[in-house]
Amino acid sequence: MTSGGHIQLFIEHTRQIATAQGDIQLALQSMQQWREAFATALKQNTFDLTGWSPQTKIANQLKQFNHKLTTHVSNWDTEWHTFSAAQSVAEVFHDRVMLLVFGKFNAGKSSLCNLLAECFRSHEQTVQYFHVQNEQIFYTESHLREGATETTAQLQGVCLGEKLILLDTPGLHSGTQKNAALTQKFIDSADGVLWLSSATSPGQVQELDALGRELKRHKPLFPVITRSDFVEEDEIDGELCTVLCNKNSEQRALQESDVLMRAKEKLHSMQVDVSLLKPPVSVSTQMAREADMNPQAMNEAGFERLFAALLALIEPALRYKQRKPAEVLLHFLQEHIIEGLRFYLQPDLEQIQQDLKQAQDDLRQLHTDLAEAVWRSVLPELPQLLEQHASTQNIDAVVNSLNEWINVAFEQQLAIQLDAYGLNLDSLSKIEKTEKMQYERIAGMVVHDGLYTTLTQQIQQAVKASTSELIDQCQAQLEQSIKHVQTLDETFIDYSAALDQLSQALRIE
């Protein structure tokens, strides 16, 4: 059985792990204050619906956005309760470092966990297997199910000694939604991640998007290339047979370099800290087992290098664990609050801004259209109105009728062209009676040619002034809402930046 130097050193080191929490109270307090201040700022920045006509497109957009915003904020407590459910696992193992064994189905996760458990047991360390079901821990004497995790809706794991936990997950790309959801739910329990992929297709780029989330959570991540072996034909006792062999060091180095390079490129494009990605190591669990895990076989199968790398991984994982309560809260603030706003509300806000700016562009044409429509509605009626009052020459009646007609015409056109706006018609310009407004008597007949000309000019001026006043009201309403969009954008940006600063302060090492 095993007695290699790095294996022994790793096991001894895990026995000395001290997992006391660091001084994170200030960080927790700062993040809670950030959350409360952000919630207050958002609630105080809902759109003012005053000035918008109910049941119109823009009014409904703003109303729906307000509802979504306030609902999103009010759900934070419920979402936090759900998000922190993974602590039911973490609290049971609060004094141990937990490494999540991560990878797609058939990556050899359970096989590797079982072999590491045997290494610990061979060094007289306690080994205890368990599985997680319905968020409860159940201990068992059985090894982890190799190749069977896909058929279960549970996580399984093993306690190695007194201070180290390996949590084996259902396949990362499990065909079972329940498995994938369970994996994601408990992923926050881990202090570091072992990313396993088979040497037949190591480090598939499409997996890195899922890994990026863990790296953004600032957990150290260690890629392990499993099944680093091959089958060759050999003649034994005169018979041709197949023999399993380790890949040579050059082959392994080539694959490891390729995985590291592609992973770094991908993570860099995802804007995550590539320093958290550790150099990959290649192993063959099967080759180690076939030689009864003797020291030479373990070394040739890559396990001396694996344990050396795990030894280097423990320190950053331990630092993560010591600040874990603050990290879990930070993850929630980043992923559910900031990202939630970005994906749930930002598209709506962008659409509102686009529609408001389009409405501004439309006002330029509406200014002309509105004035012409009112003008054409009133002017054709003027000759008949003047004839109607010719016998009495009642200028007051003429002026009052014109003002009333202009108001009615504006009301009708506003309902057609500017129905979104709650406009104030009391401030519209009116035709005022002047000395020039008189009927004339020519050859004993009452005529109104001069009066018609004067009133035509007055109608034109009143319509023009009123149209400008109404368009100005619309413009002011649009500018107010556009400014509000900008205020919300600035609020998102400012609070995101403030949270980034809290994140950096938490992770200063």
Curated annotation (Swiss-Prot):
Residue span, G domain: 108-225
Gene3D superfamilies: P-loop containing nucleotide triphosphate hydrolases (3.40.50.300)
Cited InterPro entries: GTP-bd, P-loop_NTPase, TRAFAC_Dynamin-like_GTPase
GO BP, one annotated term: catabolic process
Presence of keyword Membrane: no
Entries under SUPFAM superfamilies matching the protein: P-loop containing nucleoside triphosphate hydrolases
Keywords (A to Z) from UniProt: Aromatic hydrocarbons catabolism
Ligase keyword on record: no
Domain of life: Bacteria
GO MF annotations, alphabetized: GTP binding
PANTHER family: SARCALUMENIN, TRANSMEMBRANE GTPASE FZO
The protein, known as: Uncharacterized protein ACIAD1444
Organism: Acinetobacter baylyi (strain ATCC 33305 / BD413 / ADP1)
